[in-house]
Amino acid sequence: MIIIDGKNYACVVCLRGHRGSSCQHQERALIEVRTRGRPLLCKKCRAIKQQLKSNLKCVCHLQPFLPFANEYQELLNFTQKNPILASLFLFSTDKDIMNSSLNPASQAYTFDLGRTLPISEDILGYRKPLSLTDASNRIDASQLNEKENDSFTINQEADIFNFAKYLHSKDDISGIP
């Protein structure tokens, strides 16, 4: 095995023939030899294990997930300005949040009236965005005034649509441990 920058490398032929530990071929294309056993779940636990030189079980996934402080504060400020949004977010469950974050393409924003507001595919990053006039044209005016307490105005629908678009632009779960 050839050691470069503290990592073990071997050629493809030797790795396929299960001779990676005795490979001395420097003229062939080299591939990093992975360590044996199950990989650790996160880089933090891997670094701790290398420092302590002992077996360590990763417990990072057991720690509760807290939303980012700035984004959470922005959400609170926005919902205080729009009480309708506050009621929508109070009744969402962890399962709903998890489903919408895992598969945003299949989700449409559903409100108390049972109507759905179409997702702009610009949120998902691959098509021209819906304009607010398009969204308001898709809302049936007869549904807006069915119930006084439950109905939204077009401006409130547009606010909710913009907020949903804002939330999806903030979605970046790559940094979650």
UniProtKB/Swiss-Prot annotation:
User: Which gene is transcribed and translated to give this protein?
Assistant: cuf2
Ranges annotated as DNA-binding = 1-40
Ordered alphabetically, the record's keywords are:
Copper, DNA-binding, Metal-binding, Nucleus, Transcription, Transcription regulation, Zinc
GO MF term (any one):
DNA-binding transcription activator activity, RNA polymerase II-specific
Alphabetical GO CC annotations of the entry are: chromatin; cytosol; nucleus
Q: Where in the cell is it found?
A: Nucleus
Where Zn(2+) binds, per the record, is at C11, C14, C23, H25
The protein's name: Copper-binding regulatory protein cuf2
Q: Which organism is it from?
A: Schizosaccharomyces pombe (strain 972 / ATCC 24843) (Fission yeast)
Quick check: keyword Cell wall biogenesis/degradation in the entry? no
Q: Does the keyword DNA-binding apply?
A: yes
* One Pfam entry name: Copper-fist
